Amino acid sequence: MSTTVLFEHPLNEKMRTWLRIEFLLKQLSASQIIVDHQGALTFFRNAGELLDVFERGELRTEILKELERQQQKLLSWAEVPGVDMTQIEMHRAKLKGCATSLIAAPRMGQLLREERLISLVRQRLSIPGGCCSFDLPTLHIWLHIEQQLRDQQVAVWLDSLAPIRDALMLLLALIRQSGILRTHTSLNGFFQDNAEGADLLRLQLRLEDALYPQVSGHKSRYAIRFLPLDSERGEVPARFNFELACC
C-alpha cells in the first residue's frame, strides 16, 4: 500500500480540459469489457461526458500547438552538451507522428456521435431510472449478443479515439516530466509561490498526515491551503512539509 498521495491541479483552462479528457479516456478503457447493464451504463455515461468535453473550444488546435511547442523545446535541449540525442529524436518523432495522425483524423469523437446505440443511451441517462429494458430495448438486446461481438464493437469505438488519446497522453507525460518534486514547507497550513509559464501543479503528501490541498491559482501565481480530512477533529501542523512540482 502506498504511503503517499499525489494530487494534480491545473493552472489554466486548457490543462483542466486535458486532465478531464484523460480521466474519461481511462474510465472508458477500464470499463470496455461490458458484461451487464451496470457496466454498460458506466461505459456509455463516460462516452457521453467525453463527447460533451469534445464540444468545448478549439481542442484539436490547442493540442497541435502544444505538440509543436514540445518539439521546439526538444530542439533547444539538443544544444545542451552531453544530451542524449537518441532520446530527443525519439520523442520528436513521436510528437510529429501524433500531430500527423491528429491532423488527418475526422472530427474528434465523430464515430461515437454517429453510433445509434450510444446516442440512444446518452439521451436517457439524464432521466432517473431512464435506462430500463422497456426504455431501451436496443441496449437490452445488445447486452445479450455474444461477448466477443460486443467486445469487437467497443474496440472499434475506442480505436477511433486513438489520435486524440495518443497525442494527449504523450503531451501530459512530457509536461509531468518537466517538473521535479521538491520539498517545501507550509506555515499554518498555507503556501504560495509564482508559477510563471506553468500549466500544472503536482503535490505529494504523506497519507498518514490525513491532509488534502485546496489550490487556487492561475498562470502566474498560486496559493495552497492544506485542510484536514477530518473537518471536525483534524488539525493542520504549524509547519508541514510536502513535495511539489511546478510543470
Curated annotation (Swiss-Prot):
Record's keyword terms, sorted: Cell cycle, Cell division, Cytoplasm, Septation
A GO CC term attached to the entry: cell division site
SUPFAM superfamilies: YacF-like
Keyword Zinc carried by entry: no
Gene Ontology BP term (one): FtsZ-dependent cytokinesis
InterPro entries named among the record's database cross-references: ZapD (IPR009777), ZapD_C (IPR027462), ZapD_sf (IPR036268)
The keyword Cell membrane appears for this protein: no
Cellular compartments annotated: Cytoplasm
Record Pfam families: ZapD (PF07072)
Functional note: Cell division factor that enhances FtsZ-ring assembly. Directly interacts with FtsZ and promotes bundling of FtsZ protofilaments, with a reduction in FtsZ GTPase activity.
Similarity comment text for this entry: Belongs to the ZapD family.
Record's subunit section: Interacts with FtsZ.
Protein name in the entry: Cell division protein ZapD
Species name: Erwinia tasmaniensis (strain DSM 17950 / CFBP 7177 / CIP 109463 / NCPPB 4357 / Et1/99)
Chain's gene name: zapD
